[in-house]
Regions:
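Interfaces and regulatory segments of ATP-dependent nucleotide/adenylate/phosphodiester-chemistry enzymes
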Residues: 29-31, 38-41
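Catalytic zinc-binding patch centered on the HExxH motif and its immediate surroundings
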Residues: 40-48
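Substrate-binding groove of N-acetylhexosamine-processing glycoside hydrolases
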Residues: 2-28, 34, 75, 79, ...
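Short, flexible beta-strand-to-coil junctions
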Residues: 36-39, 57-59
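Short, well-ordered secondary-structure micro-motifs
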Residues: 45-46, 179, 234-235, 281, ...
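Feature activates predominantly on carbohydrate-active enzymes
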Residues: 2-4, 8-10, 50-263, 269, ...
Length: 629
């Protein structure tokens, strides 16, 4: 398709980038685009004959409108008009590039920014605990995937041309376990992952962080974190200053951080859960408790509060909770979630249901700014480009009161190349015979613990006994295999998902089969497991590792892959050990296989499916391998 543009020069770079992505030629020929910017105007597209008229308020509205025009033309429509009104002032994703060690490389991030603009999303955050360089602090992000100042400036420049505001998102209190492991930060460390409040060196450090995080970006906005500091003041702080109420410690810290922020001319926002947790308002997500005056007074002037909630399906919940948060700040930002952080799977049903309800209530209650969080807890096994379907959801709900799923599927296909029906199957990695009867199966991440649990000492074997898991994953592998070749940029992701399911098709019940054969004295079955099944499993796992590695190096910075190599490597070693023990038992050199003689107990003493088992160290062994691994 050839398109001639009569538009403001400020759109030229973005148009050129979109031409590469959407494969149109910028030249006189088939269509002419005439664009006008009118502040505060709804997005509108009018196509008559070969003329495309676009009215827009922001750059990203123009690119969404351009995409809508091309999409409808490709679908065979000739003369049509489209008008959309953005429901939110800002709307876009926050990608966690720290907790799981998966930091997008610049090529990937630029491609994502292009797609966000095409969707009509005008904001993006990169959540960095220590994934950015801090001046004069070489151990901050040392040997971790981090962005240089030049990297972040390059991304900000690119995003700006596409109408996407990039906002730095950091931590200035807790959630800093990786940098605080180094002794060079001992003077500013309260406990494992929290900064030492009241120590002057802490605020020198925070100043350096704020300067380094904000300097590459045009915006003055900055997210300063400060969530989930559950043990605040109970480590070195207590040794130095004695006991003080958490409320006082938070107040003192915020006051000092705000002095730095005001001096630097920044516009802060923060997660607001600590206001509720510190002041004893009986939980963060409880709608029925009044907000004490002292809580309201604790919020500094100029601080925007971010209410995060990705869990609830009930409209009444959000209707009850949002007013409590609005009592803290004149401008509350809502942060929902794209559920990819519990293992190998995208929990699409939960993402869809929670987002539809939450954003509808946000519209009705006057929430202007929306964040779609994409966390990376404990390994980021789920490939992060999978989250684009969630970004599409937040985008469409940002322009429409509700969505028609057929129209959504077509829109997602146009913007990304992905097939909705295939993406809907991704959650079947966790939604299996164990969890299908449950009301909310997304709380159960079977794919993760079935993949990483040990063969000889399976801590989860008791809870999975009696379910046809191998058959489930064998069928799912075929579904993923069929998806390869029709999902464009996601074909590699479906190849990865195929290999995950292909491994689980024999590994899920391997420990159970091995234990039964041993206890039954079935030496023929044991020999088959040692000579055929376990070597087959190892071969399948090696293929999975190589495909995973290919995807990782295509999407992310290389640093961070070491975590996954260590996980796969431990499985390979344990498979080898299992084979050696079985063969030694069969030839009589090993009197018994002691691991298989242990009684299998329900995990945590609880019957039924295991809920949200996400720490690798809690899956692979009953012994400590590393803190919080």
């Amino acid at each position: 398709m050839k398109i001639l543009f009569q538009a403001d020069q400020s759109l030229s770079y973005g148009i050129n980038e979109m031409s590469k992505y959407l494969a149109f030629e910028i030249a006189a020929g088939e269509y002419t685009v005439k664009a006008r910017q009118i502040d505060g105007h709804d997005l509108s597209v009018c196509v008559k004959g070969k003329e495309i008229n676009i009215i827009y308020a922001e750059k990203c509205h123009f690119f969404r409108a351009l995409g809508l025009a091309i999409q409808n033309i490709n679908e065979g429509k000739e003369d049509f008009e489209i008008s959309e009104k953005p429901a939110f002032r800002s709307n876009g994703p926050m990608f966690d590039v720290s907790q799981g060690g998966a930091a997008f490389n610049l090529k990937t991030m630029k491609k994502i920014l292009c797609q966000l603009s095409l969707m009509g999303l005008n904001m993006a955050m990169i959540y960095c605990e220590d994934s950015y360089e801090v001046q004069n602090r070489p151990y901050f992000g040392y040997m971790r995937p981090r962005y240089s100042e030049a990297d972040m400036k390059e991304l900000d420049d690119y995003a700006y041309e596409l109408g996407v505001e990039m906002i730095p998102c950091i931590q200035t209190l807790a959630h800093l376990p990786d940098p605080l492991r180094w002794k060079v930060f001992a003077d500013v460390k309260d406990y494992t992952e929290c900064l030492l409040v009241g120590e002057p060196k802490t605020y020198e450090f925070i100043r350096d962080m704020l300067i380094s995080a904000s300097r590459p970006f045009r915006t003055k906005k900055i997210h300063i974190g400060m969530d989930e500091a559950g043990s605040l003041g109970r480590g070195k702080y207590m040794d130095m200053f004695g006991y003080k109420p958490t409320t006082q410690i938070m107040h003192d810290h915020l006051e000092k951080v705000m002095e730095i922020i005001n001096e630097l001319g920044l516009e802060p926002m923060m997660w607001d859960d600590m206001f509720f947790r510190c002041y004893g308002t009986h939980g963060y997500h409880q709608p029925d408790n009044p907000v004490p005056e002292e809580v309201k007074a604790a919020v500094p002037k100029g601080m925007k509060c971010v209410y995060w909630d990705y869990y609830h399906f009930d409209r009444s919940h959000y209707e009850g909770v949002i007013p409590r948060h609005k009592e803290l700040s004149d401008e509350v930002i809502f942060a929902g979630g794209i559920w990819t952080w519990v293992g190998f799977s995208l929990a699409w049903s939960k993402t869809l249901k929670t987002t539809e309800v939450a954003l509808d209530v946000c519209k009705k209650m006057g929430i202007s700014d929306i964040i779609a969080t994409v966390w990376g807890d404990n390994g980021t096994e789920c490939l992060a480009n999978t989250t684009l379907i969630g970004c599409q959801l937040f985008a469409e709900l940002g322009y429409h009161d509700n969505i028609d799923m057929d129209e959504f599927a077509a829109r997602f296909k146009f913007c990304t190349g992905g097939e909705l029906a295939d993406f809907e199957n991704l959650e079947l990695l966790d939604k299996n015979p164990l969890t299908e009867p449950l009301k909310d199966p997304s709380n159960y991440n079977a794919s993760k613990y079935l993949m990483w649990q040990d063969i000889l000492t399976g801590l989860c074997d008791y809870n999975i006994d009696g379910y046809a898991l191998n058959d489930h994953y064998e069928g799912l592998a075929e579904k993923f295999k069929a998806a390869i070749g029709r999902n464009g940029q996601f074909d590699n992701m479906f190849e990865f998902s195929y290999h995950v399911a292909n491994v689980l098709a024999i590994k899920s019940e391997m420990g159970l089969r091995l234990t039964r054969a041993y206890k039954a004295g079935d030496k023929e079955a044991l020999l088959d497991i040692a000579k055929v099944q376990l070597p087959d499993l190892k071969a399948r796992m090696e293929k999975l590792r190589l495909v995973h590695m290919k995807n990782w190096f295509e999407l992310y910075k290389p640093l961070g892959w070491d975590i996954m190599d260590m996980r796969y490597g431990s499985l390979f070693a344990r498979i080898d050990s299992a084979i050696m023990e079985i063969l030694a038992y069969l030839d009589g050199s090993l009197e018994r296989i002691e691991e298989l003689e242990q009684e299998r107990l329900p995990y945590h003493g609880e019957e039924g499916p295991i809920k949200y088992l996400n720490y690798f160290g809690h899956i692979v062994s009953a012994s400590r391998i590393a803190p919080k691994a």
